[in-house]
């Protein structure tokens, strides 16, 4: 008989031992929660054109929750470090979620009551500080460079959100002034400038006011081809406005979408997708008025 051949009796004996091991293994830890149903019922398309971009077997996941968290906002993804940075405005800190093990740790404290965050195309973090009424950049060594603090010799109201132009690396930001309305999310003080959208030139540092034809400019983003700028109005407008980008100027401003009919009270962060570029369709997160795009 071939020595490598296992006879039937030995095979059955081995299988019996293996089966016993499986039978005595620890019972699975069933939590009692209902299994996740796909597609996730919390993924809702207000426009049916968005349906084809859903990933049907992906649920909405909570990355962070804490009884100490007061108001988390301004998330920005770092594609090199594979981490998400976000602000807790009243707690005056920034937190970081790391992809490899889902841990969340304090990233920066104090943060100047930062709200919106983003990264430029050299990987440096840009933050809008409510408490100090300015836009700053964090260098590779962690030092802070002030990019915008005043305009026409007056302090900004409280910069809120920023986006970096992919073509010329300029920084475009909104200044609605929420961080100066109370001490809860900044430092209470008078608003000396009309709420507006601004641009910081990447080379000269010159600050240009682009438009103040909006009540409370909040979240903002460019269309994928950079030809248009979307800005959400979290004030009386409760809408998303869009302008044509003409170099360093905006023109032909108009309402892109009204948010007044949404049950969620407001829009916050805006983002566009390349696939929807033909329609220049931004997506948003509603939270209390027109907020982020």
Please name every model-derived segment.
Residues 105-109, 145-149, 209-211, 251-258:
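Beta-propeller fold detector
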Residues 30-58:
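Blade/loop signatures of beta-propeller domains
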Residues 66-82, 110-129, 134, 152-171, ...:
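Beta-rich, blade/repeat-based domains predominating
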Residues 2-18:
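N-terminal secretory signal peptides and thylakoid transit peptides that target proteins
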Residues 243-249:
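Short loop/turn segments immediately following beta-strands, especially the blade-tip
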Residues 85-102:
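Beta-propeller domains
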């Amino acid at each position: 008989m071939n020595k490598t051949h296992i006879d039937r009796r030995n095979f059955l004996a081995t299988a019996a031992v293996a089966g016993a091991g499986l039978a005595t293994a620890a019972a699975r830890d069933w939590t009692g929660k209902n299994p996740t149903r796909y597609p996730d019922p919390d993924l809702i398309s207000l426009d049916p054109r968005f349906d084809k971009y859903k990933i049907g077997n992906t649920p909405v996941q909570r990355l962070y929750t804490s009884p100490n968290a007061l108001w988390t906002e301004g998330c920005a993804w770092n594609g090199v470090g594979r981490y998400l940075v976000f602000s807790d405005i009243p707690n005056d800190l920034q937190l970081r979620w790391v992809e490899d093990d889902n841990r969340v740790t304090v990233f920066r404290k104090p943060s100047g009551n930062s709200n919106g965050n983003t990264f430029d195309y050299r990987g440096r973090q840009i933050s809008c500080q409510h408490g100090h009424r300015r836009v700053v950049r964090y260098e590779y060594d962690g030092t802070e460079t002030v990019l915008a603090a005043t305009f026409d010799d007056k302090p900004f109201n409280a910069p809120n959100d920023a986006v970096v132009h992919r073509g010329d690396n300029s920084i475009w930001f909104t200044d609605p002034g929420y961080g100066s309305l109370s001490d809860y999310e900044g430092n209470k003080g008078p608003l000396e400038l009309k709420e507006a959208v601004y641009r910081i030139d990447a080379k000269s540092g010159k600050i240009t006011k682009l438009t103040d034809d909006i009540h409370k400019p909040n979240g903002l983003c460019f269309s994928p081809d950079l030809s248009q700028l979307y800005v959400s109005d979290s004030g009386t407008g409760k809408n998303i406005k869009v302008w044509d980008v003409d170099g360093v100027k905006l023109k032909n401003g108009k309402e892109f979408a009204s948010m007044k009919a949404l049950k969620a009270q407001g829009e916050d962060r805006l983002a566009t997708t390349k696939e929807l570029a033909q329609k220049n369709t931004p997506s948003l997160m509603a939270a209390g008025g027109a907020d982020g795009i």
